[in-house]
Amino acid sequence: MMNKDEAGGNWKQFKGKMKEQWGKLTDDDMTVIEGKRDQLVGKIQERYGYQKDQAEKEVVDWETRNNYRW
C-alpha cells in the first residue's frame, strides 16, 4: 500500500489507469480530480449519470484492483 506522497508521485500512472476504467473522464476532469477521491466520485456521477453509491462502489473496486489509497 502506498502513502499519500507516493500516490502523488505516481499520479500520472494512476491517471492513465483511471482513464482506462472511465473513458468518459476528460483531461479537464483529471485536472479537477488531481488525486482527490471525492472529486473522482463526483465526476463519475456527472459523466456516467450514476447515483453516488454506484460511483462509490466503482471507485472502491478500482482502488482494490490497483492497490490505490488516497
UniProtKB/Swiss-Prot annotation:
Q: What start-end ranges are recorded for coiled-coil regions in this protein?
A: none
Q: Which Pfam families match?
A: CsbD
Output the superkingdom of the source species.
Bacteria
Q: Signal peptide location in the record?
A: none
**SUPFAM superfamilies, alphabetized:** Hypothetical protein YjbJ
Q: Which family does it belong to?
A: Belongs to the UPF0337 (CsbD) family.
Name used for this protein in its record: UPF0337 protein YjbJ
